[in-house]
Each structure stands twice: as C-alpha cells, then as structure tokens.
Design a protein with these regions (language model features):
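Catalytic Walker B motif of ABC-type/P-loop ATPase nucleotide-binding domains
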Residues: 162-165, 420-423
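Conserved ABC transporter NBD signature motif
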Residues: 60-71, 78-80, 324-334, 339-340
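Conserved ABC ATPase "signature" region
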Residues: 104, 108, 115-133, 364, ...
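ABC ATPase "signature
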Residues: 222-223, 479-480
Length: 773
C-alpha cells in the first residue's frame, strides 16, 4: 500500500469573492520531494498554508501524519512534526535577532533544553556553512544565507513533513544549488521525511520526484516529471505545462522565434561608465560599466538585491549616482531633462498602475502626463494589440496577473519610447503570458528599433537576450552573448556558467556535511497542552530582545508614559483658581468701585488691566487672556441709590464649560455677599431676596485639584493604551515580515497570537508604573 504525506479531498478556499482553490483532490506521496508547480495566483501557497495549519480549513478534508488536519487536537499534536517555510526570503526569520538567537527561539518553541539547543544549533550552522556568522543579524544576511538560516530554523526539531513555499525565488543560482544539495544530504540521513515544495520555476521543478501542476485553483496533472513529459510529448516541463493549460488560455500561443538583430547606425542608446551608488556605508552598485546599442535586447542577470533595480533607477534619473556617468542617446542622464526622459519607457518591478482608475483611464492619464495630443487612436491601437479592449472599464486590481502585465507594458510604450527599461517584468506570470510578452519585446526591438534593457533572475529569459551582464553584490561578473559566456566557462547551460562566475567571485565552495539527527525523538515526544508556558516564554523573551534593539519602540515604551503623565497632569486642568479678570467700569462711582473691590478680595480671581471698550473686551476673552470681565454700565451708582434696578454685565470665557460653570457660581456668591453687605450698611437689615434658592452645602468648601484626579487615571490609562499599542506595532511588523506564520502555527487554539507580547508588556509597565509612583 502506497504511503501518503498528505491527502486532499475536495478542498476549496476563497478570499472574499476570489476562489483560490476549487475542489482540489490529490494524494501526495510520502518520503519524496513533491512539487506544486504553476505561476503566481494558482493556489499553491493556499494549499500549503492549509496543510501546515497556518490557514484555517473551510471546505473539504485534509489528512496528514495519520490524522485529520481539520481537527484542532490533531493539529496541536502534529505541529512539532511539521516544518513550514513561508514564501519570501527568510520570511520566517526575525531580522533584528542574530543567527544563533533565531535558532534559539525556534528551539525554545519545541521545548528543547539549553544543552540540546546549543548542540543542534552548532550542528546546523556547520552543515549550512553559517558557522562564521553566528552573531550577524538575520536582516543583514544575503538572500542565500537567509534561506539557509530559514531552513535551519525549520529543521531544528527534525520534522517528518517539511513544507517549502517557493524557497529559492529571488536567490542566485549558486545559492539555489547549495540549498537543494543541503536538502538532498538531509534526506539521506532521514529517508522517511517528506518534502512538499511550491515552485514557479519549471527548470527547478524538473528535479523533483513527483509533481502536481495547478492552474486557476485546480489540478491539471500529477505524476513524476518523466510521466508528465511523456503524457504531453514535450521536451521541457515548461512546454508540458503550456500543453496542459485549457485551450482557451493557450489559444494563439506559438513557439517563440527570435530573429537575429541587424546593427543600426548611430551612437549607443545607453552607455554607463563607473556607475556607483552608495546608501550610507552600503555600496549597492559598484563601478558598473556597459554599452547597449540601438535596438538591442540587453539583459541584467542576477539575484534579488544584487543592484539591478538600483542601476535601472540611475539610468532613468530616479536616483542620482554617487559616482560615474551615464548617457542616453548620447546625452548625460539628467532628472530635470524632460525631453530625454520622454524617450524612456519604464516598467517597475511592482506594478505602478493607479488602482482607482480603469484600464482606459490609466492609459488616458499617461497620455496626458506625456502631453500626447490626439492620443485616442494610439490608446485604441494598444488596447487592441494587447487584448485589453474587453477589460477597458475594469480596474487593474481586479485583473489577472498576465492582463495587468500587458496593461503595464501598454502604459510604458504609449508614448513610443526609444528605450524601454523593464525591471523583473515577468515574475510570477504563466509561461503563455511570458511568451506573449517576449514576442512583443522582440517585435519592438527588431521592427521599431527600440532598445530594451531588462532585468531578470530567470535563466531561460536571460538566454533570449542579445547580450547579458551577470551581476552579483553590485558588481558585474561577466558580459557578453549568452552562448559566448557558456562557451567561455565550458558549461552546458547558462545557469552552470553563472554559477561558475559566482564561485570564482566567492572563492571555492566549502564542503558542508549534514549533522546526524538528534532531536527527533525529543520533539516527537513533547507533550502538547492547550496552553504551553514554555512557548509563551519563548515569545516573551524574543520580543524583549527585539524591543531592546528597536530604539524607537523602546523610547516610546519608556518615555511615552512619562510624557503622557506630564502632559495630562499639567496640560489638562479643571482648577478654578487665580482666574484673570478685568473691570469695564463705565460709571466710575463709589458704588461701582465698592463692587469691584469685592472681586479683589477673593483668592479665586486675579485682577488684570482694565478694559476700555467692548472690542478690546471681546478680543481679550477670545485670546484667553481673561476668564472674566465685570462690565459696570453708566449710572450704575445713581440707579442703585434711587432704588431702581441697575443691570450688571458679567462676561465669562466659556471655552471650558466646567470652569465657566464653576466661575459663574463664584460670581453669584460674590454678588449675593455684596448686596447683603450693601443692605446692612444702608438699612441695618440683611437683603430680602425675591426668591430663595435652597441648596445642599457640605461642611467643607469643595476644592477640585486636577493633578490628584488626572494623574492616577493617566497611570491606569497607560497600562491600557501603551501595551496595546506596542502589541499592535509588534503584530503589524510580524505580519509585514511574514513571521506571523510562526504565531499561527505554534500557538495553541484559543491562545491569541499577541497574548505573549501583551502579557509581557503589561508586566513590564506595571513594574515601571510602580517605580514611577
């Protein structure tokens, strides 16, 4: 009976209205390297995410490692038997932690004691050649070294099922070869371990033991590479994949034919001499020189981070070079030379389209930016040529990846540029769309004489260029026609030739040996509890180390509460004391002066310069200079002596209603006291008021001091806000870097992915608050 690593039964998955998986049923054999192949967006990552437990199963059934992955108990029991590397360079790593600290964190997750963690870490570092860099932060490693470290973190507990989501995308061929050699040596020591890999590289997938080809969320073929080639009568896996696609999708596709280039007279289209770009102490491009003729297709070959995109940005004027010169059509590159820039078409690595606009509106906007009169016929021509007419009113975000790529190219060539600069234009696109894209480039080069400068890390694309420049670590390793470079190295393929140049640049590769397995039994026997204090402590310790190295977050955590206490304690005050007031005495009588003297004797009021007119009174109240103005009208004293009813104006600043209401109470009390004293002095009797207000009076005079009321509340507010904000920042950083998958995989159901950091920050701030108090 055939053993299976995983069995999928009618598995479906949706993201909103988009269907990622549509009833997938497949049995993946155990003990081999099984590959899921297909371009971006076909559902490979979703399938692996469901298998690893990172994503929640919504429809269908998955069996793996002897149980149902839909069961929370089984997922909890088998998580120590599964290792998962998410898509992207080192996406399961923590960039501020060193190589050893990353491994130590994963060892703690699986409950390994300190002695075993040290031994296993040393073995893995020696096996992968990372032992010279134990203290280097993961964020400062090269792409290949990040992938090796990510693999070490996945292997520290000796899993039975290793899940790799496009593990070599963007790394150089030498690092890719070393990565798979390491996997091969590891499988020699553990032949029963199953490896499931997602890959969009057909040349890489040809080395796997078993394949499942996917398209639009469905399986289109399964079997060994030889079986798939035999089934489709194809010579390469890429040709086989094209043959397996639905007829509607590959309609009109034909084999790519590249006619020879006919040299054109005139100066070179692009020429760079000693081009250098530095970012602080880091040199991204190091004295790069090349010459590209008119109508030539020139390729920049290299891994992510080698300097290709930076060089292209310098040629377009987006980045001023630190050293060196560059010319376009014989003119120096100048960011302010709009005429020269209008002769350049640029297609960035990430789609630079306007998501709020439709396909047609994106083209119209670009025509307006380049000041193209009568661009309607040109837009209609491009929409017809690139098959965009049926999508004219659709937004770019809703389009398939291949259609979006065609729109990006149409925008780049709308103004008929003489130079077309393309930065990784076909990454993630299916082979049919890639061939159509290249056919358009070949037509523009051979028919229209457009110079095309394209960067790529795909060897089959580099082989289509007239000339290529192999680049690594900001330097050009070799330049020439692809066949000449292969011949010069005595290699069989362009990849072998590139690897040879990389080995020459890096020195002889070291002989790496894989250490024997020692942690499997302990990891497999580790008890699985609903809440594991060891895992909680691992996350808390890791976040503490990250926080200590993040000066911005650390300053916010330590200084934020102090600033908040000072700001809230002294900046927010409801104290009604020493209120500035001014007199607007238009009577100047003995009675008016006696009235104003009652304010001068109160500790709640502080006299300011008198007001001379109403405009001044309004201005001083609005600016906050005064909180109270006492307006005594003309003839106030005479009306008072004649037993008339004089009017008195009290103007209050109502910007703070609480203070204004309290001030009004104080003024009312002063007025009652004044009229009572006036009545006693003139009649010998207290004043008889027409209405008597009865109010409850405490035996003490209530006094509201904000500092005693606000600051204790601020301390409690900080204990709520600061840890929550720090946790939110931490979770967002985890999600952006991709390491949030570690939370989802390793934390038990019901235990929030941010609980560890939240509890740590609560404990820390509680202690800090006690010290500050």
């Amino acid at each position: 009976m055939t053993a299976y690593a995983a069995v999928f039964d009618a598995v479906s998955h949706r993201y909103g209205k988009a269907t990622a998986l549509d009833g997938v049923s497949v049995a993946i054999p155990a003990g081999c390297i099984a590959g899921l192949i297909g371009p971006d967006g076909v559902g490979k990552s979703t399938l692996l995410g469901l298998l690893s437990g990172v994503k929640r199963l919504r429809s269908g059934r998955i069996k793996a490692l002897g149980g149902d992955m839909g069961s929370a108990r089984h997922r909890r029991d088998c998580r120590v038997r599964i290792a998962y590397m998410p898509q992207g360079l080192g996406r399961n790593l923590y960039p501020t932690l060193s190589v050893v600290e990353n491994l130590d964190f994963f060892g703690r997750l699986f409950g390994q004691p300190a002695s075993e963690r040290r031994a296993r870490t040393g073995d893995l570092l020696v096996s992968t050649g990372l032992d010279p860099y134990p203290d280097r932060p993961a964020g400062k490693l090269s792409g290949g070294m990040k992938q090796k470290l990510a693999l070490c973190c996945a292997l520290i507990h000796e899993p039975d099922l290793l899940i790799l989501d496009e593990p070599t995308t963007g790394v150089d061929p030498l690092s890719r070869r070393q990565f798979w050699e390491l996997i091969g040596r590891m499988r020699v020591g553990r032949p029963g371990m199953s490896v499931v890999v997602a890959s969009a590289d057909m040349d890489e997938a040809a080395q796997f033991d078993w394949l499942a080809a996917m398209n639009a969320g469905r399986l289109i073929a399964t079997g060994s590479p030889a079986e798939i080639l035999s089934q489709t009568h194809a010579d390469s896996l890429e040709e086989a994949f094209i043959a397996l696609l639905p007829e509607a999708q590959r309609q009109g596709h034909k084999a790519l034919v590249i006619p020879p280039r006919v040299p054109r007279p005139g100066p070179p289209a692009i020429e760079a001499t000693g081009l250098t770009m530095r970012f602080g102490g880091f040199t991204a491009v190091d004295h790069v020189s090349f010459r590209i003729e008119t109508g030539e297709i020139f390729g920049f070959l290299g891994s992510n981070g080698c300097g290709k995109s930076t060089t292209m940005k310098m040629l377009t004027g987006l980045l001023p070079p630190s050293e060196g010169t560059a010319t376009l059509f014989g003119q120096p590159v100048d960011a302010h030379d709009l005429q020269t820039r209008k002769r350049i078409g640029y297609m960035s690595q990430s789609f630079s389209l306007y998501g709020e606009l439709t396909v047609r509106q994106n083209l119209v906007l670009d025509a307006q930016l380049f000041d193209l009169p009568g661009a309607g016929p040109r837009i209609a021509e491009l929409m017809e040529h690139y098959g965009l007419a049926t999508f004219a009113d659709s937004r770019p975000d809703s389009l398939p990846l291949g259609i979006r790529q065609r729109l990006q190219l149409a925008v780049a060539v709308l103004h008929r540029p003489g130079i077309l600069i393309l930065d990784e234009p076909t990454s993630g696109v299916d082979p049919v769309e890639r061939d159509r894209f290249w056919q358009s480039l070949i037509d523009m080069s051979r028919r229209d004489g457009v110079t095309i400068f394209i960067s790529t890390h795909f060897m089959n694309e580099a082989a289509r260029c007239d000339r290529i420049s192999a680049m690594n670590a900001g330097k050009v390793l070799a330049e020439g026609r692809p066949e000449d470079l292969i011949r010069a190295r005595g290699a069989h393929t362009l990849e072998d030739a590139f690897i040879g140049y990389l080995e020459d640049a890096a020195g002889q590769p070291r002989n790496e040996q894989l250490a024997p397995a020692r942690a499997a039994a302990r990891a497999a026997g580790r008890p699985n509890r609903l809440f594991d204090p060891g895992r909680c402590w691992a996350y808390a310790l890791r976040e503490t180390m990250e926080l200590r190295r993040d000066r911005m977050r650390l300053a916010f955590a330590l200084l934020g509460p102090i600033v908040m206490m000072i700001t809230f304690g002294f900046g927010i005050s409801f104290d009604v004391k020493h209120l500035a007031y001014a007199a607007f005495d238009q009577d100047q009588s003995l009675q008016s002066r006696t009235l104003l003297q009652s304010f001068e004797g109160s500790r709640y009021f502080l006299a300011a310069a008198p007001v001379t007119d109403k405009a001044q009174m309004q201005r001083r109240l609005i600016t906050g200079e005064l909180a109270l103005v006492v307006e005594v009208p003309p003839d106030f004293g005479r009306d008072l002596l004649n037993a008339r009813t004089p009017e008195l104006g009290i103007w209050l600043d109502g910007a703070m209603p609480f203070r204004a209401e309290t001030t009004r109470g104080y003024v009312t009390g002063l007025m009652l006291q004044y009229f009572n004293e006036l009545s006693v002095g003139s009649t010998g009797q207290t004043a008889q008021l027409a209405s008597v207000n009865v109010a409850v009076r405490f035996v003490y005079n209530p006094d509201f001091l904000s500092v005693f009321a606000i600051v204790p509340g601020v301390i409690m507010l900080m204990l709520v806000l600061i840890p929550a904000m720090m946790t939110a920042v931490s979770v967002v950083q985890e999600k952006e870097s991709g390491s949030i998958a570690n939370f989802r995989r390793h934390l038990s159901p019901g235990w929030s992915s941010c609980s560890a950091s939240r509890h740590l920050m609560w404990w820390w701030h509680s202690r800090a608050s006690c010290r500050w108090r």
